[in-house]
């Protein structure tokens, strides 16, 4: 380890490789541990070969002792005051035992986690408004150590950066495997001082997931699977290289767009999807509503649905995002969703965690 002294502080020689922290599944994180400093680089999932964000994670006890690289955002760990803009990351922090660090959230109306709702009602968590345009005054008042948010291609955080708020770019959703996305919990754990907890939890998730995959490889039948439904004239389906498509495969299903190479969402015409889905054995989708949907409602919504085999056979499964914990859990507990899909594909189990079979 090569260190040089500058005004009593140590600066780390970037030419030294340090100790690499291995990520087994996540493709967009590299981390190197130095003495009192962890250098984390998030690769840009939208532009190969470039860096989305670089962080210097410095333990609070070493504050002032290290001069980080000039292109790195400094995060003093463990984070004590965080604003979290997505429900999955709220849930993760609670699962890792760091829920008390959450001082603000965005899009409170879409959060179903009781811990967050109760604290928001008491005023110990502040609603910072819409995640796409958060209320700057509330953020300033909270004086967070960092703000967790999900980036998108071409997104800018200039307004937040101008007020000095360190941004944690939660690009985990761009991973192409479910375990790759879940493994980001190990990065987030570095920020909150819960590395051992995250390592233990991820080991459990990995074991559960891979055990189910090995079991499903023995299945001889592979039901054809259709996902989602028409929205404003467009049928949005997961790309064939998405984590959802791979989950379906790992559960033993044959996703109708498995041969597609996109990792993001496909924006398709209803007619095109129907032509591929006419023989689909299972149809599952997510919606927001106050009550369960019926087949009659679906038929009224779009008459083409009734030509799908799964519609005729009654193998339609709905997940109500308004009341389910689906969005809060599945990002970092893919083993839960894999178990659910396996039950749907093979056991016709009606006691499911997220989905319900449409009865009418």
What are these regions (language model features)?
Residues 1-4:
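Sec-dependent bacterial lipoprotein signal peptides
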Residues 6-90, 197-226, 312, 325, ...:
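Bacterial Sec-exported substrate-binding components of ABC uptake systems
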Residues 46-140, 147-149:
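A short, structured surface patch at a secondary-structure boundary
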Residues 72, 77-81, 92, 124-130, ...:
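Second-shell loop/turn segments in exported
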Residues 89, 94, 105-115, 155-157, ...:
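Extracytoplasmic ligand-binding site segments that recognize negatively charged/polar headgroups
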Residues 126-152, 165, 270-284:
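Proline-aspartate-enriched helix->loop->beta-strand connector
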Residues 179-204, 285-360:
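Structured C-terminal subdomain patch of bacterial secreted/periplasmic proteins
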Residues 207-296:
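Flexible, glycine-rich surface segments
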């Amino acid at each position: 380890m090569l260190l040089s002294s500058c005004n009593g502080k140590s600066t780390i020689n970037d030419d030294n490789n340090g100790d690499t922290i291995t990520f087994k599944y996540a493709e967009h994180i590299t981390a190197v541990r130095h003495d009192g400093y962890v250098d984390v680089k998030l690769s840009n999932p939208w532009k190969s070969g470039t860096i989305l964000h670089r962080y210097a994670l410095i333990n609070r006890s070493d504050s002032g002792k290290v001069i980080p690289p000039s292109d790195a955002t400094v995060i003093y760990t463990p984070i004590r005051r965080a604003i979290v803009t997505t429900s999955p990351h709220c849930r993760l922090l609670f699962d890792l035992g760091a829920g008390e660090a959450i001082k603000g959230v965005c899009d409170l109306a879409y959060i179903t986690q009781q811990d967050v709702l109760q604290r928001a009602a008491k005023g110990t968590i502040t609603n910072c408004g819409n995640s796409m345009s958060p209320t700057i005054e509330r953020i300033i008042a909270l004086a967070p150590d960092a703000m967790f948010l999900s980036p998108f291609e071409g997104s800018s955080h200039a307004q937040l950066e101008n007020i000095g708020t360190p941004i944690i770019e939660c690009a985990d959703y761009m991973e192409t495997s479910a375990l790759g996305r879940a493994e980001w919990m190990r990065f987030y754990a570095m920020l909150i001082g819960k590395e051992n907890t995250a390592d233990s939890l991820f080991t459990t998730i990995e074991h559960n997931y891979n055990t189910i995959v090995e079991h499903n490889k023995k299945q001889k039948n592979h039901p054809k699977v259709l996902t989602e439904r028409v929205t404003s004239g467009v049928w949005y389906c997961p790309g064939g290289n998405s984590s959802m498509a791979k989950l379906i495969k790992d559960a033993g299903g044959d996703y109708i767009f498995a041969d597609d190479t996109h990792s993001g969402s496909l924006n398709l015409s209803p007619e095109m999807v129907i032509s591929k889905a006419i023989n689909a054995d299972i149809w599952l989708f997510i919606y927001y509503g106050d009550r369960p949907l019926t087949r009659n409602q679906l038929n009224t919504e779009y008459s083409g649905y009734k030509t799908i085999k799964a519609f005729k056979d009654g193998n339609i499964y709905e997940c109500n995002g308004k009341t389910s914990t689906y969005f809060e859990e599945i990002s970092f507990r893919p083993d839960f969703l894999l178990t659910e899909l396996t039950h749907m594909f093979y056991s016709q189990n009606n006691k499911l965690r997220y989905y319900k079979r449409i009865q009418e």
